[in-house]
């Protein structure tokens, strides 16, 4: 028998009758047990001095009221452009799977916790490359062992090996993982366009 609290919608199972307070509590517990943002921000803080007075583009800046953007980490950048596909958040609109409307090229592009929400991954990677200056850097982070979120647009979980193949046109500068090797919760890659 199926629980009255879980509704099967297509292949995704979602909670449907739980009060928002309970769902928020569950989200907080998940973020404590499976952190992705804290390790990512530690990594970004460690590299931020290298990007002083340079141009930075952030893909998927998200809701700044809950500190999803990394702008505060790169306060020493010459230019920090925030983008999102949700134009109601007040950022510049950018869909990295479509024709790019941005003329500038960037020294660093941040694409953190975004790729798992993009179905047309090859177009996204091609456009990330387009947005970088020659020898520019790209930070990509993706969750691995992590609950579904932002449904129904949570499509992928990438292994380290898949990311290496997908970004084979880039030079890998750094690979970080959170969790243990066989059960990583997140991957963080620093690539260089070459």
Feature roles, as predicted:
Residues 171-181:
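Conserved S-adenosyl-L-methionine
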Residues 154-170:
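Short alpha-helix
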Residues 54-149, 160-161:
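Conserved SAM-binding loop
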